[in-house]
Amino acid sequence: MPLPEPLNIKAWVEENEHLLKPPVNNFCLHRGGFTVMIVGGPNERSDYHINQTPEYFYQYKGTMCLKVVDEGKFRDIYIREGDTFLLPPNVPHNPCRFENTVGIVVEQDRPKGVNDRIRWYCARCESIVCEEEFYLTDLGTQIKDAIVAFDSNIEAKTCKNCGHVNSSKREPAEF
């Protein structure tokens, strides 16, 4: 099989930006060994993803905020247009994408036996509310399925520490 031609990101985004809107917000450009996604904004997710492999971010258009838990403390990392960032393994993170932004994310395929986690923290007291662990084979469906399951389960959404009922959605981020 001959090698594919290079992809012009600018032209692709101009032709396909409609694919980068809610509810999906992303398009997989490549699968096999690693996944390359183009991701648009805005998004509303409140969950934190934890994977045991690094995750690479390149911000093509606009600014995004990568919410992380860094050594037990919540912190925001702003990745501006033209910036790149390599997130180390096992860092809880929530990529907040603003309106009219486009980024590229690269994730390594998970080795057998290496599970991902999706975690929700309480919006009021920051305690862990719920955490699900799974072997990730399809970024496009499995995280969405976990979010839908969380949002439909009042017990999973209720903080055991303070009683606050949380949501899978947050207010759309603005910069």
UniProtKB/Swiss-Prot annotation:
<keyword id="KW-0223">Dioxygenase</keyword>
<dbReference type="Pfam" id="PF06052">
    <property type="entry name" value="3-HAO"/>
</dbReference>
<comment type="similarity">
    <text>Belongs to the 3-HAO family.</text>
</comment>
<dbReference type="GO" id="GO:0000334">
    <property type="term" value="F:3-hydroxyanthranilate 3,4-dioxygenase activity"/>
</dbReference>
<dbReference type="InterPro" id="IPR011051">
    <property type="entry name" value="RmlC_Cupin_sf"/>
</dbReference>
<dbReference type="GO" id="GO:0006569">
    <property type="term" value="P:L-tryptophan catabolic process"/>
</dbReference>
<dbReference type="GO" id="GO:0034354">
    <property type="term" value="P:'de novo' NAD biosynthetic process from L-tryptophan"/>
</dbReference>
<feature type="binding site">
    <location>
        <position position="45"/>
    </location>
    <ligand>
        <name>O2</name>
    </ligand>
</feature>
<feature type="binding site">
    <location>
        <position position="55"/>
    </location>
    <ligand>
        <name>substrate</name>
    </ligand>
</feature>
<dbReference type="GO" id="GO:0019805">
    <property type="term" value="P:quinolinate biosynthetic process"/>
</dbReference>
<feature type="binding site">
    <location>
        <position position="107"/>
    </location>
    <ligand>
        <name>substrate</name>
    </ligand>
</feature>
<dbReference type="GO" id="GO:0008198">
    <property type="term" value="F:ferrous iron binding"/>
</dbReference>
<feature type="binding site">
    <location>
        <position position="162"/>
    </location>
    <ligand>
        <name>a divalent metal cation</name>
    </ligand>
</feature>
<keyword id="KW-0662">Pyridine nucleotide biosynthesis</keyword>
<feature type="binding site">
    <location>
        <position position="122"/>
    </location>
    <ligand>
        <name>a divalent metal cation</name>
    </ligand>
</feature>
<feature type="binding site">
    <location>
        <position position="49"/>
    </location>
    <ligand>
        <name>Fe cation</name>
    </ligand>
</feature>
<protein>
    <recommendedName>
        <fullName>3-hydroxyanthranilate 3,4-dioxygenase</fullName>
        <ecNumber>1.13.11.6</ecNumber>
    </recommendedName>
</protein>
<dbReference type="InterPro" id="IPR010329">
    <property type="entry name" value="3hydroanth_dOase"/>
</dbReference>
<comment type="pathway">
    <text>Cofactor biosynthesis; NAD(+) biosynthesis; quinolinate from L-kynurenine: step 3/3.</text>
</comment>
<feature type="binding site">
    <location>
        <position position="159"/>
    </location>
    <ligand>
        <name>a divalent metal cation</name>
    </ligand>
</feature>
<dbReference type="InterPro" id="IPR014710">
    <property type="entry name" value="RmlC-like_jellyroll"/>
</dbReference>
<feature type="binding site">
    <location>
        <position position="97"/>
    </location>
    <ligand>
        <name>substrate</name>
    </ligand>
</feature>
<comment type="function">
    <text>Catalyzes the oxidative ring opening of 3-hydroxyanthranilate to 2-amino-3-carboxymuconate semialdehyde, which spontaneously cyclizes to quinolinate.</text>
</comment>
<feature type="binding site">
    <location>
        <position position="55"/>
    </location>
    <ligand>
        <name>Fe cation</name>
    </ligand>
</feature>
<keyword id="KW-0408">Iron</keyword>
<keyword id="KW-0560">Oxidoreductase</keyword>
<dbReference type="GO" id="GO:0043420">
    <property type="term" value="P:anthranilate metabolic process"/>
</dbReference>
<feature type="binding site">
    <location>
        <position position="93"/>
    </location>
    <ligand>
        <name>Fe cation</name>
    </ligand>
</feature>
<keyword id="KW-0963">Cytoplasm</keyword>
<keyword id="KW-0479">Metal-binding</keyword>
<feature type="binding site">
    <location>
        <position position="125"/>
    </location>
    <ligand>
        <name>a divalent metal cation</name>
    </ligand>
</feature>
<dbReference type="GO" id="GO:0005737">
    <property type="term" value="C:cytoplasm"/>
</dbReference>
